[in-house]
Amino acid sequence: MDRERQKKAPIYEALEAFKKKRVVPFDVPGHKRGRGNPELVQLLGEKCVSLDVNSMKPLDNLCHPVSVIREAEELAAEAFGAASAYLMVGGTTSAVQSMILSVVKAGDKIILPRNVHKSVINALVLCGGIPIYVNPEMNQKLGISLGMQVEKVKQAIEDNPDAVAVFVKIGRASCRERV
């Protein structure tokens, strides 16, 4: 990983450069960089609202990134050691649903922990996928889920070789010896 390259913030840098051009906003968002809503400026701060602009060519487009968003995604992938990364809006729910809906079709099986977020279940309802549940281990003393054990996931894969995906949710602290 190129540590110097990782110091870049392409989207933020593009927003700052755009701000310096002093373009007059005639589109969304309606607060017009805070000029139309002093209460919003007070709540979020001038810095935040001054950079809140609509997507336009100099700032790239999330639907088809070709410049600063693409560069930010490449930097994220490099930082995570992944082949690719995608920036999302709409929170984790939209990211989870995008992942599942892009892979699982009606009648397809997906292996997942029994305690998944409702966004996973909603995605399965939308696509018609069939959940194959793996019960997570529990810390009885603390009453918290520890995640799925590798052996149980391997068994679920062996029992369901036609499954098209395995959905894994992991907290950083529970990565060791867990899926």
Which residue stretches match the model-derived regions?
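Short, acidic/turn-prone active-site loops that include or flank metal/cofactor-
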Residues: 115-118, 135-141
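Substrate-binding/gating loop at the entrance of the active-site cleft, primarily
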Residues: 112-131
